[in-house]
């Protein structure tokens, strides 16, 4: 059988010009990424058409048959990759173009992965040996080759030898193209984490050479590595650093290094780049050492430096060293909203900009993203107190598993700026912060004691609760004795006991509390360029009430509102009296009606016409828009009248002035008066947006005009630097002395080169004089608890609590001014310009001038004790050494008698103010018996509390004896005595 003729494809096509019928197409399907990639590679391989003739051939030749399809390369799963990766060899020349395209796609994939917080953590690849990865000055990736001369393909994880990685890894050192050789030692931890994160895998690389060029241009991109708390780092690689600075002509900057101290868990040293360390003042460098000691002890503390000494910069630099040393991973910074911008600025200065995560915006989704990123990658989370209060469960990690379970605590540090905000531990703000787990807590506050000692205890209880114990212990051991000893009318024995207890308190908190004052850090003796801070003179301007203010003040004291407030809360009546002292137009309708009620007994006075007219106008009973005096009322308010005379003098001399008031309504009145005089001004209050505040502050600091800046104390007194102004006017005093101090320190801070004069306006013989006395009393408590010298006792609480009474000397004389003049009159040292300025002030019809800066400038001398007082004090002092050694359980009275029979025990307490029928001799006998029981060491050793309850009973009996001995004879009282607690008044 003959075989069939061979089938000639080309012959058949030549014989029959008719093309065959097209094959029916399948249903169109969407092209995937691989299909588009295959089409692109084939088109790239074929290249453009070689036929230059654009006209088609009428008889075209059929296309050549397609080449046999080659098998697709195998795909494998690599750690750190989302997609399957094709394997290729370096000798496969045909895949060169495919490799370049795949490299582009892989690079895009890794970049997208780096933007996601959900990407998997890089895992080590045990089957791939570590590859030496070198960075060269030539940024061309094609020059990077392996030791065997082959080009690395996409089957290996990319090394950091591209432009972005080289610049990112050394951006913090300010190194540009002068880099000649930088070697990293690679561990077995490889994984694709994107260009920005490849060099930051945990424990992946250790610097072998650290040389840098000192320049002001430095990137903050990848200066610090991630948190690393493992001990398997090659210490020889870290310590055996080879210096190549001489080869390239670099100027080397030495790092600041501190070794671990004590027996804490920290075993790695602290390293801070020298560029950052050189930015700090000497007192800030000392602050770094103090913070490092706390870190090694595993506890926290209070940074209480005076306002304007750069507390934020100290903490930022300390965090920079911790991140640089790989000692921490996450930090939570809680601050008022107005201070977050300042924190961002300071953290950026120390090259921590890329560590910042903002958790303060209004968008909840954006905040949650930042929080999740901080959990995943670490960093510094900036937020506010209110956001923590509402979201503390999320911040403590209740709803996420993004952090490693091996970590002991979620947050390494919780830092509270303006930490006195949590001075009341019962508030939701304080309780929410207590819920957040952390290893260290740092409180930043220039005023840790604002009203009473309990506020200082609250701050210590937050950051280091083991220092002062619980609240009851602190009150019984420290607070009561110090307050009694600080009273001007205290007995000699009370003063000695208070002084010794205060000394013990200072020694107790000394390791955990750091406070430096500006006059201690920057001495006033400097001149010229050596003078880092100017002088400050604070003056109390004692003003005389106008006739209108006097009539309103007296009328309100006779009103029913004052009499009813004496039986209840006096705050409403106190507020009205303060408004009358500032400006009568501040009175509300209800307050004006109360003033009218008190005018019945004063109708025969000559000047009642205008006063009654103003009161009726305020109460909406009369309307007289033509009365200019009622609209602005410079002659109605002594403060406004004096202020306009002072501004005329200051502006004419070219000074810039800050004016602070507690209320926006008072600022409105001042603003109207300034507009009438034609002065330019700027203003910030609670209605000003934060973005606008920054612009307004910049305009004042750098702008050519607007010599007057109006601010409210609650907004403008916090976080602003206004060193262009050298004159500050505080219109109305606050119950909280730190409020006024913060306002003053907007101008008196680092960077102020002019001498600052502060004017605190006070009205003589009014409620404001009582407020000023209370400020001084609170300031004495703070200094007694924190400063190592005996403080002057200016006032007693009995002087302060006489609020609702007319001054016997009238409104033209200030007894406080006379007392301060007698106390500090001989200390006045003024230059000619200040002396002339005070003479000008005294010509404005004021009651007098006091020098607030001289308060507490003298060291008081304790009076000598008689024999009986000396015996009592010697007996009481040993108890100060043993009182606090017990546990934190509550002390109870009569513990010795019922130590072995706790079920039959009935607690008995003593009130210092209660009347006792026991004589001092009987109380002393009880103390002696209990002391003998306490001396029986065998019995005390068997007690569960080791005698703490007995010591508590002895202390209570001793306090009771002190009250009885110091109490005067009972006086006949004409009526019910008003009892007002002024310690908690902080507004």
UniProtKB/Swiss-Prot annotation:
Query: Which Enzyme Commission number(s) are listed?
Result: 3.6.4.-
InterPro entries tied to this protein: Helicase_ATP-bd, Helicase_C-like, P-loop_NTPase, SNF2-like_sf, SNF2/RAD54-like_C, SNF2_N, SNF2_RAD54_helicase_repair
Biased-composition ranges for Acidic residues? 226-237
Q: Which residues form the Helicase ATP-binding domain?
A: 292-466
Compositionally biased, Pro residues: which spans?
18-27, 51-71
Residues annotated to bind ATP: 305-312
Region Disordered, residue ranges: 1-172, 224-245
Gene Ontology molecular function? ATP binding; DNA translocase activity; helicase activity; hydrolase activity
Cellular compartments per GO CC: chromosome; cytoplasm
UniProt lists compositionally biased (Basic and acidic residues) regions at: 99-110
The reply on keyword Protein biosynthesis is: no
Task: Name the family.
Answer: Belongs to the SNF2/RAD54 helicase family.
**Cross-referenced PANTHER family:** DNA EXCISION REPAIR PROTEIN ERCC-6-RELATED, SNF2/RAD54 FAMILY MEMBER
In Swiss-Prot or TrEMBL terms, this protein is called SNF2 domain-containing protein ENL1
Instruction: Provide the gene name from the record.
Output: ENL1
